[in-house]
Structures are given as C-alpha cells and as structure tokens.
Amino acid sequence: MAGSRLPRQLFLQGVAAVFMFAFASLYTQIPGLYGPEGILPARRTLRPQGKGRWQQLWETPTLLWEAPRLGLDTAQGLELLSLLGALVALGALLLSPLRHPVIYLLLWAAYLSACQVGQVFLYFQWDSLLLETGFLAVLVAPLRPASHRKEAPQGRQAGALPHEDLPFWLVRWLLFRLMFASGVVKLTSRCPAWWGLTALTYHYETQCLPTPAAWFAHHLPVWLHKLSVVATFLIEIAVPPLFFAPIRRLRLAAFYSQVLLQVLIIITGNYNFFNLMTLVLTTALLDDQHLAAEPGHGSRKKTATSWPKALLATLSLLLELAVYGLLAYGTVHYFGLEVDWQQRTIHSRTTFTFHQFSQWLKTLTLPTVWLGVASLVWELLSALWRWTQVRGWLRKLSAVVQLSLVGTATVALFLISLVPYSYVEPGTHGRLWTGAHRLFGAVEHLQLANSYGLFRRMTGLGGRPEVVLEGSYDGHHWTEIEFMYKPGNLSRPPPVVVPHQPRLDWQMWFAALGPHTHSPWFTSLVLRLLQGKEPVIRLVQSQVARYPFHKQPPTYVRAQRYKYWFSQPGEQGQWWRRQWVEEFFPSVSLGDPTLETLLRQFGLQEKSPPRTRSANSTLAQALHWTRSQLSPLEAPALLWGLLMAVGAVRFVQALLAPCSLRSSPLAPVSGEKRRPASQKDSGAASEQATAAPNPCSSSSRTTRRKK
C-alpha cells in the first residue's frame, strides 16, 4: 500500500504557507481595524473581570492577556503576534526541522489569540477552517525528522511510524465535512437560484470581490452556467464520499475534481486564502506513489502477476467503472440533462423536490457518519498491524505509547467534529451520542471543530447591492470615497488581491445586504473618517494622497446604496453600470445628535482617551519602526513579495541539493541530511555493491541503513 509521507509533508508546508499569508494580511490592517484610532479598538475586548489568570485564559484563550507585561497595548500585542506568526510560518515553509508539532501549536495559538479580539472582522468561515486545520497540523507534524529515525518496519517508508497516518485521516474527514456541507446547504436553504440552477448567472458579478476573469465568465451562455451548477453539486455532494473509497483511482479522481473546482474559483474570485486552504486539505487524498516518491518505484521491473491479484485488479476496475456510471446516471436523471444538437446546448433542470431532497438527506447523513467510523476503524486496525511489524521491545513500547496517545486524540477529535457536522440535518444532530455533545461543548471555544456551509444563498438577484461613502465640506457638494478593492468606480477593472483579504471591503459587502443598523461597526467607520484618522484612511486607500480628503477631513459624511451590474460587452471603457437605490446612512458631522445616538446605542463611544503608557517601551518602538518600513507597501504586493521570496529560496535550495533529491517533487531542504546506505536493496543489488554510490543514481534513493 502506498505511503503518505510526502502528502503529509506537502500538507504541513501548505498549512505553513496559509498561516504566513493570513498573519501577513492581518498585520497590514491592524492599526485601522483594531488600533486605538481604529474602527473596533481591540483593547475594548479584553477587560479583566477579577478572575484568576488561568480562568480568564481558558474562557478567553488569547496570548494577548500577556501584552501589558511586555509594555504593549492589545493592538500592539496583536501586531507582535502577527509578525512572529508570519515569520515562524515562513520558517516552517522553508526549513523541514521547523515543521514540528510545537511550531504548529504556536501558530494555532497565535491565530486563535487574534480571533478572540478580531470581532466581526475575523468571523469568517475560513478563519475557523484555518484554526481547525492548524490544530490538525499539530498532530500530523512528526516529533522527529525521518532522517533521525531508526529503520522502519519492512514494507514501509524509511522512518515511518505506525501512528503517523491516523491524524492525517482527520484531514480527509475535514475535507469531506467542508465540501459535503457546502453542497448540501445550497439546497437546504431553498435558495431559488440554486434550485433553478441559475446561481452562476448572478454569482460572478455579485460575489464580494470579483476578478477581471469574472466579467468574462459572467457573459458565458446561460446553459453553460446551469451546467456548471450541476457540476458543482456533483463535486460537492456526490464526490466527497469517494474520499474514503478503498480503490485508489477513485480517490485520485475525487482529488482532481476538487482541485478543478478550487482553481476555477481562484480564477474568478478573490477569496483570500480559503481556496488555497482547501487545496492543502486535498493532499490527504494523495499518496507517495502518485507523487512519484516511492523508493525505487520507477526502476522496478514488471513481474508476472498472480491470478488472485489479477482478479482483484479486474474487480477493482469493474467497481470503479460502476461508480463512474452511477454518478453519470444520477447526474443525468436528477438534473434532466438533455443534449440539443440543433442549438448545440445542454439543457438541465432540477427534477427532484425539496421534500425529496430532505428525505434523502435524512436517510444519508447518518450513514455518512458510519462511513467515517468504518474508515477510521480501518485506519486504527492498519496502525495496529504496522505496530506488530516493529522490531525490538523498546521500539515496540515507544511505538505503542505514541499510537495510544495519537489514536485517542484522533478518536476524540472525530467525535467532537460529529456535532458541527450534524448541523446539516437536525434529526441526525439529535441522535448523536451524548458524549460527543459533551466533548464538543467543553472545547467549542477553542474552535477545534466547526460547521461549514459556503454560498448558502445567492444574494443580489436583482443587482449587486453596494454601499458608496461620500464626503463633503459644505453639505451640498459631495465627493465619493473610493475603496481600493471593492467595486465603486465604474471604469476601474476588478482587482486581483488573492491571497490577501481586505477585511473592511469584505464587511462593506455584507453591510450592503441590510440596513446600517445591522452593521454597528459602520457607524464607527463614519466617525473615524470624520475625525480624519490615518490608520482607517489607509484601509480605504493605502496611498493616503489618493484619498480625496487627505488634506482636511470632510465635515459631513453620508452613504448611498446602489445596485451594480457588470457592463455589457459593447460598452467601451466600462466594467460596471449602476443605479441609485436609496440613502444607506444619513448625512452626519462630528457632534451630530444622530451620530452620537448611534454610537451610544452600539456602545462605541470613547469612555476614556486611549492609554499611551506603552509608547516609549523598546518593543513598542521596534514595532513602530517595523510598521513605518512596511506601510508604503500595499498588502497584496507584500504577500506576493513573500511568495516570490519563498520561490527564490526554493529555487536556490533545488540547485544546491544533490541530484537524487532534485528528482523528488518534495525534496528535503536544509536540516535533513542523507546518510550513505550500507545494506543492499533487493531491487538494486549491483548498484549497492559499490563502496561509494553515485549520489545522482536512482539507486541512492532506495537504500536503507543498518539496524
């Protein structure tokens, strides 16, 4: 059976990369979002209630409780955490010795600390997904690099331990929960666009931050949009159970279908690090053999296959074809696919009702839980069998201790995850074991397991709602305040900002969906613009000179609600067209009774001036200097610069690595040393006979050390 050493390494590197992007993106926005002059100052969220130190840390788990001990306020502590998090994640991405459980525990704790004070700007599903994935990385990461281990059991990768595949199975289970729930909620929401298969005729122009490619995708034929929705349901609902298929090719087919979906989303929408995180999760569907990493895999000679193996291969192929046929039949049947040869189109429609789907979901949800149980039991039994192959009583004892600890943690996390997963079907939620509910309730605040369900309802069916802020000096002549990323200027093309998430622009999209009273932070934003606070202005325009009121703050600020649509192909120089709908926020000025009432109603009034006692501490000055050096860079440029730096370092590492390591798609980097083998491999006896094997020969990768 193919191992999972390289997929695990790929997963750990991917998690490190996403943490790096997430911390760096957040760092650029902290002063405007959480600083003393920000929209929602972080210092308001951490108020000691007279509780013990450990009690308040458990109830509100954030390292920022310790910021005053370092001479920092809460926002400065958040800056320090973000900087250190980005640097540590960068190190883990480049150096294999840093892919250690302690490192990933620190990254997880730092991001959890940020989420505790992040308020509405850190309430996104991908923030929860990163926390859950980051904690799984703590279990997946090896305690010791493979190069420092003794010989592995026969038939296993060098350095493999019996328990190593167990936590990696949880990654596959998380991917299943994410995708299956995201598909199911589109139908349980009763959204007419999803049920009518017309969701993508609206999605590209109504999503939060479209890319330029979204304009072109929006103008594709309607029948292709509807067929794409059918494909989405297929990939998100029907394919995920194949993640646990015993047939390897089915798992690989499921892998490529998920990759296709995520890549298309990345091309047409700016969803920060979410799609990258999902791609990282898909590594749990891979194996060493698929990554061309099995020792000697390419040099093995074909041998005659015994009839039992041939029969098993034939049965596997027949079962595989049966699964593909069943998926094809179900798609054609339940979505009424018909080919119109004259018009060269494919017609599609939903042929089942909401009641039928609800009954199907009620019937299927609990069996998917048992599918997970069966798959986990198989992994546990496989780990036990691998343990029996360990030689030496001391190694056996060490292996059984590790297997017991990791196995218990894996089962516990699986039980915890069943509670949020069962939210997709209330009946299943009520039938879960009460012990799972108690476990989940005990650790819910740590976000070890979360419920998911993206794009539940399609918004903007009658046009994309958009809030446009305006400022004025006299209350009669108004100037629009244009944001860097969200739609505003009709002639400006949509930007490409992935993997950065401009969190204010995202919340502006949510604010436009309802009245301003549903978004209390918006009143604080208006206040900061009236006050001319530069940290907030930099969230709107990083180059302050481009802000229309950079010389003097506006006397009045108001907001209008528009409906936006993509322009038609024939309109030259225009990406958008719009229509005024209504006033979103009334015209106010500093001291205006309306503004003061709203601030008091939402608890946003400044009760005391911000403390400045930490301004002179050495650490605070270092943070201030770092900010001054990085502030001229726009956030996407900073993140792309980090990505290019990683690519450059990897390129240099590849050049300096031995030839035998270059051929591997995940060649080990600094910190992993290879030792010459002294024991012959059965498939390369002649090459091993030499005293000093050529480091560039294929046999050098298949050698083993003596016990």
Curated annotation (Swiss-Prot):
Bilayer-spanning residue ranges: 10-30, 78-98, 102-122, 123-143, 165-185, 227-247, 259-279, 310-330, 364-384, 399-419, 637-657
Keyword field contains Oxidoreductase: no
Any single biological process term in GO: protein maturation
Chain residue ranges for the region called Disordered: 665-707
Glycosylation sites: 489, 616
Start-end of Polar residues biased regions: 679-691
Entry keyword set: Endoplasmic reticulum, Glycoprotein, Membrane, Transmembrane, Transmembrane helix
Matches recorded under Pfam families: LMF1, LMF1_C
GO cellular component, as recorded: endoplasmic reticulum membrane; membrane
InterPro entries associated with the record: LMF
Annotated membrane topology: Multi-pass membrane protein
Subcellular location: Endoplasmic reticulum membrane
Keyword Transmembrane on entry: yes
Principal location listed in the UniProt entry: endoplasmic reticulum
UniProt family annotation: Belongs to the lipase maturation factor family.
Record function comment: Involved in the maturation of specific proteins in the endoplasmic reticulum. May be required for maturation and transport of active lipoprotein lipase (LPL) through the secretory pathway.
Name of this chain's protein: Lipase maturation factor 2
Natural source organism: Homo sapiens
